[in-house]
Amino acid sequence: MASILDQYEDSQNIRQHSRMSTANIGITHSGFVNVRLEEEKPIFTKQRIDFSPPEKINQFSVCNNQLCMSLGKDTLLRIDLGKPDQPNQIELGRKDDSKVHRLFLDPTGSHLVICLTTNECVYLNRNTQKVRGLSRWRGHLIESIGWNKLIGSETNTGPILVGTSQGIIFEAEISASEGSLFNTNPDQYFRQVHYLEEDGKPAPVCCLEVERGLETKYFIIATTRKRLFQFVGKLAEGSEQQGFSSIFAQNQDLLPSFQEFPVNMGYSEITFYTSKLRSRPKTFAWMMGNGVLYGQLDYVRPDSLLSDVQVWEYTQDIDLNFVKPISIVLTQFHFLLLLPDRVRGICTLNGQVVHEDVFPEKFGTLQKMIKDPITGLVWIYTEKAVFRYHIQKEARDVWQMYMNMNKFDLAKEYCKDRPECLDMVLAKEAEHCFQNKRYLESAKCYALTQNYFEEIALKFIEAKQEEALKEFLIKKLVNLKPSEKTQITLLVTWLTELYLNRLGQLEADEGKQHLFLETREEFRTFLKSPKHKDCFYNNRSTIYDLLASHGDVDNMVYFSVIMQDYERVISHYCQHDDYSAALDVLSKHCDDKLFYKFSPVLMQHIPKKVVDAWIQMGNRLDPKNLIPALVNYSQMGSMQQINETIRYMEFCVYELDVKEEAIHNYLLSLYAKHKPDALLWYLEQAGTHVSDIHYDLKYALRLCSEHGYLQACVLVYKIMELYEEAVDLALKVDVDLAKSCADLPEDDEELRKKLWLKIARHVVQEEKDVKKAMNCLSSCNLLKIEDILPFFPDFVTIDHFKEAICSSLEEYNKHIEELKQEMEEATESAKRIREDIQEMRNKYGVVESQEKCATCDFPLLNRPFYLFLCGHMFHYDCLLQEVIPHLSVYKQNKLDELQKKLAATTQTTKARHKPREEDTVSLGKGQGSREQIKSDIDDIIACECVYCGELMIKSIDKPFIDPQKFDQEMSSWL
């Protein structure tokens, strides 16, 4: 048998369907043009399944992609739509004349209940091929089943509700298991829980629906031909498996809650729409005699599930005497009504017919329309054919309907991905709010539209709604792109003006201070907005002008801080004598240039705080740039300012270790004028060497001299090494001070003696103190009694000098004795040296024949050689080669010269084969000269052993490779 789903007929020509639409007109004052480039596809598209049933289709059901249909009298066709090429045909095996009355398929597609016209029911599970009878159900014509969606599974339905044609509601449970030996029936139990009637007579239970509300609350909806019943109750936590009988018991003592309509067409049908899988239904539609009752499902309401209900009355062409609606299906925004020859779609938002599809007569009368609650597909069948409806873009025109109903939030939700439609909704909402005097909401909506800016602004201005205008401008500003700088500048400036106007009005009204503070905070938040920081900065002069024109000093200062225009802020505080606040701004932002600019003013009024701030800044401030402020107010200010100036100068010198001469000179001048006690201490700790001094010595000398600080002058003279001037000035202060100066020139004994003579003359001639003059002799070993005698007057007796003269004579005698002893020691030393020389002449060494040179390791006796006391022996040429690299340039040149002379004397000797008699004298002289040359050469190269002497010690720190030849040596190894 061919598949019914994997093949389709060629697409049929789709007629233009009647549905809600709007002409394509441009949006007034909008940047959008509503143009549809191609014809939109209809919302409901019908497709016929390529399937020709071998027998007439009696009943049809589909759920969770599981399709079941009854064919003829005894055949059941079951198809898994996921595998449409594997249909499953099952024979019911009925011998009587019974026919299939209804097919009931649960939401999982696992449990199928087949109701027969003989008041019998059979059961078929998805996973079996065997049909099993439901014996407990016998005797009842089943019209509806309310499935348990929460605890139903593939093998067990859980407690379900069953409605019969006689108005009885049963509770039952079906299990797919084979059961025990004594109970093989799938129906676990079947018990009556309620009874429905109309006009005092039993009424068939057309539909049953069970839904769980919040927590353990349950709602049961049952419909008859004219009535819709609701049963509300709670089940104990964990008792869901026990069934729903307790809910009906809770409603037994109450009058049944139902809605009734007068017209009876013999049956009714209710349908639900669920937006998401396994969620609760949100809307319902009940097809009955008077029309279609539809609305929302509100699970919060205590006694009724239905809300916002309304009735769609049948159109005139639906005459219940001739043309009755057969089935109904509910979608998100429409319900589809199945008539004998057509399908009609009605929008639930406005009740308008938006779709109508007429079926050709060749397919026969339409039997029923079914919607798969899981997949959302709609199925329609006749006795000869099966059709399927696809629903696409159902919400595309919903926005317009909501807009016309003034439900703007919903309208925006359904057109958020269509800018041109969203703009229309916003414009309509803005106009609606404006007409209802909700100006702020109107402004927010207008700001999001593409309407002309000028028109909207004028609209609020004419209505004298500055707050709404401000809100409009704010929202418009937020939506501008950073590249739209001109528009941003315009809006920022305008908003600033509006804020300032509003603040001025509120400030004048004492009763609105709270609102004033809120508005000011809002304005300041606007001023410091990071998004518009660049705009404010580029147009800060304009903003300053606006703030100044309104006299809003506080906000001007606030804006200046935001713009980091601290100079303006500090100037403002200084102009209003708020110097502490000005200093706080300076200290907070640590701008050295601003410190230099405003310190003179601040130092005049708050010197201590200013100096504290300077000290806190530390090295970030250059003290030289602060001198003008310090000099100005140290000359004309109070003592406090002077003390603070000295404190900062001391901080610079002692803490920051500033070496600028100007700073040290200024501190000297302050000490000289105001703290003379600190002057001498400063000079002493500053150092005694010129390289350690950071002040101007001449300036310091002049300063100390002007103020009469002689001791300080002496100290400066000493540093300047003007010892004579220092001694002369020190003698005016203290002789001991002069003595300390006289000993300073240690390397110049003549000067020291001269200075001590000055001191001695002063002591003798000025103080006339002979004893003190004698003490000068003991203090300086350069002075003798004869040096100071000329300073004494003639009438002084010798008794005053007796001790000094005796002491001098004793020193002379002692010195003579020392000289005699030194002479004797020198004579003795000379004698020992002569003895050593004589001993050396008699020394010798023994050289064995097998001895070898310490350098070349060849036999020593083959060539001239040297023998050292240490035992090392070298050939003459080997020793020469070892020593030359270690000789100085001078000695190398001298050695070279001696070798040339030696070679010359050797040549001369060889040329004289037979010396003449007269040449004997000259030959002796030449022989002596040659020996002298050899001796000189020996003194250079053989003065010490090359391995044991100083040459070897000095070579320790020499590199193995000559630095000049290092690169060459390095390259040779590569």
Swiss-Prot record:
Main localization, broad class: membrane
Zinc finger residue ranges, RING-type: 853-948
Keywords of the record: Coiled coil, Developmental protein, Endosome, Lysosome, Membrane, Metal-binding, Protein transport, Transport, Zinc, Zinc-finger
Localisation: Late endosome membrane; Lysosome membrane
Membrane topology: Peripheral membrane protein
One of the GO biological process terms: lysosome organization
A Pfam family annotated for this UniProt entry: Pep3_Vps18
Residue segments, region Disordered: 905-930
Coiled coil: 461-481, 799-852
Superkingdom of the organism of origin: Eukaryota
Stored InterPro entries: Clathrin_H-chain/VPS_repeat, Pep3_Vps18
GO cellular component: endosome; HOPS complex; late endosome membrane; lysosomal membrane
Molecular function, one GO term: protein-macromolecule adaptor activity
KO phenotype (gene knockout): Mutants display hepatomegaly associated with large, vesicle-filled hepatocytes. They also have defects in pigmentation with reduced numbers of melanophores and no iridophores.
Ranges: CHCR repeats: 618-772
Known role: Plays a role in vesicle-mediated protein trafficking to lysosomal compartments including the endocytic membrane transport pathways. Believed to act as a core component of the putative HOPS endosomal tethering complex which is proposed to be involved in the Rab5-to-Rab7 endosome conversion probably implicating MON1A/B, and via binding SNAREs and SNARE complexes to mediate tethering and docking events during SNARE-mediated membrane fusion. May be involved in vesicle trafficking to the hepatocyte apical membrane and play a role in development of the intra-hepatic biliary tree.
Subunit structure: Component of the homotypic fusion and vacuole protein sorting (HOPS) complex.
Family: Belongs to the VPS18 family.
Protein name per the record: Vacuolar protein sorting-associated protein 18 homolog
Organism name: Danio rerio
Gene (name only): vps18
